[in-house]
Amino acid sequence: MLRAIQRATEYRARIAKDIKNAVRVHLIDTCGDSSPSSIQEYVDLLLENGKARYMWKTTDLESLTGTFEGLFLAPYIIAGISSHLEMTAGLPDELTVSTYPQGALALATVAAERALKGWVNGRDTIGEDLSNKKNEEFSETLWGTATKTVMTSIKKISAKKWQKILSAVTEAIPQVHSTPKLCKAASVDTEDARALAYEPNSD
């Protein structure tokens, strides 16, 4: 049980770390080497209450038509889904889920919000103040409500939209490995005694 909790914590931490890096790259690409005030202004727009601009590839302010485009296609959210796929690649069929990675998308979305909030002063402050470490954690306690809230939108995603999201992930990582770099998927020997072991129910 303890190991399962540890693995879940490591999974969340990896997604949060990869998204934090992707947010930094996105802000530098978008704002250039501009002053912290420019980054702060941009982050404020992305996180503006009632807008959730950070969830979109193109916001209402960037679009020529003044509309939002590309829900869940922001590059840092795609980076989070990429992390999920890399960590779960090569799992035995019995452990894989046939549906779309809704939970991973929810985690990626709120991890992006968390990472952007670290830039509200125009520079990344996450991890800077050790006395504030508990309030910066990417934990269920701090981010559970946000994760459940964003799931409401995720449950409405159509199969066609999921294909767009997964295509964007494939483009973001040049080669999506079918197995993790350090391991290969195991084959099954159905003639092995371990596979043939069986005991019928006794009276």
Question: Can you name each region flagged by the protein language model?
Answer:
Residues M1-Y54:
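Helix-rich alpha-solenoid scaffolding regions
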Residues K57-D203:
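Long, contiguous, well-structured interaction cores
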